[in-house]
């Protein structure tokens, strides 16, 4: 199999614009309609299209550059592999030449007046970290196109029927000749439907659909992360001419929490610790999210503070983080300690602090003593004394 870059006559460093220009030139030169249906031209044209379909797709091009034809000729010819299956020259021509030339390829195969699937819809939903942690059932209101209940989707007034378009004869497409090309395009009179509604339905005004708001219940699974997507099949817009409904895609956004940050399945939380507790050791309460067995029904959990704890020390509580979507695993709650210096001291408290300071030395403050020693050596090196 020939190298795709060689087929298009370009180097491996060519940019997108150069690639498109090279393809356009070769496609026009080798198009079968310009070569009297020559089999060699048809084969060359197919080869050019295949090469461009891979190199114009960043992911496929990266796979091809790394693995060659093996990287794009997957067994299914699907995402990540071209393989020649599912290839439609009209998709490429629409991209490069526009609709006029794109409609020439496969246009006759596409039945504009056939049942059409409804549009997919997107709904952005904000949820709390608590809802992401425990799961939730949320009601949303979604506007969507519904089949008109009066005309049952025909667009025509009850008791009447749409007429066949006289321009396209019901095909939904018309054919015209432009230079070397025989071009098919959507019928301008009926809009490609092949039918004309002469007496429109008063409820949908001839569209066959009306827009309505629907209330849907959405189940948020425990453990979802920010940016997760939920698909509700058949909850999108109604299809045209009896086609199936589209799907509804719900994109989740988890609002920032005032206490917790999420890191994968772990929850991170900074908790202030009294100076005395940090020095002597002890226990403090840390917040945790309610749900399951992680906090035993409480919204706080006991954290052991080791003697001499410093700011920035972390304590990891196993299994008290977020649940996993795909297993029974749970993350951890990671508590970062922040040693709090007391303020607004009374005279007696200040006196005791001074007394404590006089009793503390290098043994009690090893980091301070180490820092002083380093600073002293630095000063001696600078001054030469």
Swiss-Prot record:
Gene Ontology cellular component list? cytoplasm
Q: Drop me one GO molecular function for this one.
A: heat shock protein binding
Q: Does the keyword Glycoprotein apply?
A: no
Zinc-finger as a keyword of this entry, yes or no, is: yes
Which residue numbers delimit the J domain? 3-68
Cofactor(s) of this protein? Zn(2+)
Q: Any note on cofactor binding?
A: Binds 2 Zn(2+) ions per monomer.
Q: Which Gene3D superfamilies match?
A: DnaJ domain, Heat shock protein DnaJ, cysteine-rich domain, Urease metallochaperone UreE, N-terminal domain
- Tell me the PROSITE patterns matching this sequence: DNAJ_1, DNAJ_2, ZF_CR
Q: Sorted alphabetically, which InterPro entries does this protein's record hold? A: DnaJ, DnaJ_C, DnaJ_domain, DnaJ_domain_CS, HSP40/DnaJ_pept-bd, HSP_DnaJ_Cys-rich_dom, HSP_DnaJ_Cys-rich_dom_sf, J_dom_sf
- Provide the residue intervals of the CXXCXGXG motif repeats: 148-155, 165-172, 187-194, 201-208
Q: Which GO terms describe its biological process?
A: chaperone cofactor-dependent protein refolding; DNA replication; protein refolding; response to heat
Family per similarity comment: Belongs to the DnaJ family.
Record text on subunit structure and interactions: Homodimer.
Against NCBIfam families, the record matches this protein to: DnaJ_bact, PRK10767.1
The protein depicted here goes by the name Chaperone protein DnaJ
Species this chain originates from: Caulobacter vibrioides (strain ATCC 19089 / CIP 103742 / CB 15)
Q: What is the lineage of its organism?
A: Bacteria, Pseudomonadati, Pseudomonadota, Alphaproteobacteria, Caulobacterales
UniProt lists the gene as dnaJ
